[in-house]
Structure formats: structure tokens, C-alpha cells
């Protein structure tokens, strides 16, 4: 029985020693992150869709900060994200990538042909914003309010029943941009 306790104590001491060495090394050899990259990464929508040409939002933020990449390539973030990045970097806002001529592109949303859906859940696993709901071997559907139109759910579908379709702007689908609405605060007088 003593041999077991000796082995437990030895392994515990080794774990403690190696943990202390790793803790010291992580602080001693730490690499400082670029604070500009961190701020840009916080502004980006974190959908990891790859529409900007980079595998995720962090690599795109690094490319903007370090390589001078254009700030207008984030499709899910749109103009709001581009304007925030332009303000952060003190650069001129640019027209969104690929739409220099058109002012507001049609918003695309994934649509599942429920007659052909086999319920494999591959689209649910691929969706970075959890806009697709359903269960194994059950009908799946897309919550259009959450869908960013990133196209990541289309390729994994084995029956090819997912397509991106433009959404017509209706009073139900139109989003108020509260930052562009002028708001004036009117002081209230209190009478005693």
C-alpha cells in the first residue's frame, strides 16, 4: 500500500514541477499580440465564413493590420463593420468589395428544400451562426433572421437541397438602422 502512495506522491510532484516550469516559460517567452489586430477582430462579426478570402475573421484582421488589406471585404458585417474599421484605423471608408456600383445588395439567405432533406445534420454542423434548426432524420429549416448568407451550409449537403436565395425587403425583413435615425433629446421641465 505504501508503494501506491509513493507513486501517487511522485507523479503529483512531477506534475507540480512541470506545471511550474510551463507557467514560467509561458510568461517568460510570451509573445505580445498586436492591440490593433485585437480591436479589428472584436469589430468583425466572427462568422468565420471565408467570404473575405481568409479562413476566418482573425486572419483577416491580421491581414488588415499587418499587410494593409482592404477593409471592405467582410460581406456578413457589411457597411457597418467597414465604417467601424475605417474609424479605428483613421482611413477613408471604401465601397463594399464587389459592389462599388450598387448601393445595397440583395440579402441572401439559405433555403432548404424540405421535400429532399434527409435530416443528416451536416448543414447544422457547418452553420457558424446556428441559423439552421432540425434533428437527425427530421426536417431542417433555416431561421432567416439569423442567416448571414455565408454559403457554408450548401457544400456539405449530400442531397443538394440547400440554395441561397435573395430576400425581398419587406416590412417584416427590413432592419432598422438606429444609428442613422436622428434622435434629439428634449429636456423635460418639472413644475413644482
From Swiss-Prot:
Textual note on the cofactor: Binds 3 [4Fe-4S] clusters.
Keyword entries, A-Z: 4Fe-4S, Cell inner membrane, Cell membrane, Electron transport, Iron, Iron-sulfur, Membrane, Metal-binding, Repeat, Translocase, Transport
Binding site for [4Fe-4S] cluster 2: 117, 120, 123, 157
Pfam families, alphabetized: Fer4_21, FeS
Top-rank EC class of the record's enzyme: translocase
Binding site for [4Fe-4S] cluster 1: 49, 52, 57, 74
InterPro entries (UniProt xref): 4Fe-4S_dom, 4Fe4S_Fe-S-bd, 4Fe4S_Fe_S_CS, 4Fe4S_Ferredoxin_RnfB, Elect_transpt_cplx_RnfB/RsxB, RnfB/RsxB_Proteobac
Record-given protein name: Ion-translocating oxidoreductase complex subunit B
Domain 4Fe-4S ferredoxin-type: 108-137, 138-167
Cellular-component GO terms for this entry: plasma membrane
Description of how the protein assembles with itself and partners: The complex is composed of six subunits: RsxA, RsxB, RsxC, RsxD, RsxE and RsxG.
Signal sequence bounds: none
Region described as Hydrophobic: 1-26
Limits of the 4Fe-4S domain: 32-91
Biological role: Part of a membrane-bound complex that couples electron transfer with translocation of ions across the membrane. Required to maintain the reduced state of SoxR.
E.C. number: 7.-.-.-
Source organism (scientific name): Escherichia coli O17:K52:H18 (strain UMN026 / ExPEC)
Amino acid at each position: 500500500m505504501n508503494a501506491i502512495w509513493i507513486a501517487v506522491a511522485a507523479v503529483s510532484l512531477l506534475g507540480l514541477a512541470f506545471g511550474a516550469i510551463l507557467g514560467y516559460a509561458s510568461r517568460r517567452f510570451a509573445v505580445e499580440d498586436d492591440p490593433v489586430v485585437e480591436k479589428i477582430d472584436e469589430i468583425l462579426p466572427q462568422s468565420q465564413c471565408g467570404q473575405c478570402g481568409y479562413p476566418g475573421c482573425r486572419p483577416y484582421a491580421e491581414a488588415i493590420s499587418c499587410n494593409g488589406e482592404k477593409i471592405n471585404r467582410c460581406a456578413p458585417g457589411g457597411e457597418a463593420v467597414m465604417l467601424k474599421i475605417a474609424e479605428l484605423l483613421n482611413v477613408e471608408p471604401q465601397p463594399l468589395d464587389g459592389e462599388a456600383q450598387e448601393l445595397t445588395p440583395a440579402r441572401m439567405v439559405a433555403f432548404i428544400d424540405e421535400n429532399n432533406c434527409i435530416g443528416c445534420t451536416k448543414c447544422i454542423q457547418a452553420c457558424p451562426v446556428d441559423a439552421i434548426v432540425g434533428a437527425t432524420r427530421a426536417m431542417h429549416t433555416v431561421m432567416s433572421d439569423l442567416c448571414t448568407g455565408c454559403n457554408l451550409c450548401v457544400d456539405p449537403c449530400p442531397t443538394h437541397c440547400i440554395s441561397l436565395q435573395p430576400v425581398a425587403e419587406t416590412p417584416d425583413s427590413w432592419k432598422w438602422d438606429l444609428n442613422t435615425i436622428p434622435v434629439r433629446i428634449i429636456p423635460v421641465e418639472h413644475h413644482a
